[in-house]
Design a protein with these regions (language model features):
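C-terminal motif of bacterial Sec signal peptides marking the signal peptidase cleavage site
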Residues: 15-18
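Intrinsically disordered low-complexity regions specifically enriched for long asparagine
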Residues: 20-25, 202-204
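Early extracytoplasmic/lumenal segment of secretory-pathway proteins
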Residues: 22-99
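Extracytoplasmic ligand-binding site segments that recognize negatively charged/polar headgroups
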Residues: 38-41, 91-205
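Sec-dependent signal peptide recognition
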Residues: 2-9
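N-terminal hydrophobic targeting signals that begin at the initiator methionine
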Residues: 1-2, 20
Length: 205
């Protein structure tokens, strides 16, 4: 069963609180929170120069990474740190919108054209299914990339038939030989699919 996961780029509503930087200093900083290895280091290094060409202003980029969606959301929700741009999966965006944790995207920036309307209608429709009330998701998030959760296996040790059978993840033959992605959603999803395998095969769910 294929599961598509969108990674989205969005603006985060942050509470300044007792921050150490003045508001003016904070405006000269772009804080990005993303998955590891998603943006080339050369892009991060070149961004300040591009930004100055667009606006005439200097900018400092602070780039932090996370490996679990829930860790990212908790860090922001509890006000441990503020970010301007974060890149969570789509279900986290839906939860953040419910709690008014997001700011609309500024579409008028420097000399850069607004390419957001060129996004495929299908993708825009899919994103907007998560909209809350009169708030359209596409005003707060942009599709960044997508991925498919799957299973990797060593063909010298596992046959194709074994790899296609979800139950083999619990097979004693593979005990202590299986590694799983550290993702609550993927782990729960796999367990639920396995528990309802018969109903799925019968088309009941």
């Amino acid at each position: 069963m294929k599961k598509f996961k969108y990674i989205l780029l969005l603006a985060v509503l942050f509470a300044l609180g007792a921050c150490q930087r003045s508001q003016e200093e904070r405006m000269a900083v772009l804080k990005v929170y993303n998955w590891a290895d998603y943006i080339d280091e050369d892009v991060l290094a070149e961004f300040p120069e591009w930004y100055k060409e667009q606006t005439g202003e200097d900018i400092e980029v602070i780039y932090q990474t996370f490996d679990i969606n829930e860790v990212m959301r908790t860090k922001i929700e509890r006000g441990h740190e503020d970010f301007d741009v974060v890149c969570p999966s789509e279900y986290i965006i839906e939860r953040m919108m419910r709690k008014d944790m997001l700011l609309p995207i500024n579409r008028e920036f420097g000399e850069t054209p607004d390419y957001i309307p060129n996004l495929a209608p299908y993708i825009q429709d899919e994103l907007n299914k998560m909209s809350q009330g009169d708030k359209q998701v596409t005003d707060y998030a942009v599709a960044y990339m997508w991925g498919t959760a799957g299973i990797l296996y060593n063909t010298e040790l596992v046959t194709e038939e074994e790899a296609l059978e979800c139950a083999n993840l619990w097979n004693k033959k593979f005990s202590n030989k299986v590694l799983m992605k550290d993702s609550y959603r993927d782990c729960y999803g796999l367990a639920i699919i396995y528990a309802n395998k018969d109903r799925i095969e019968k088309g009941e769910v």
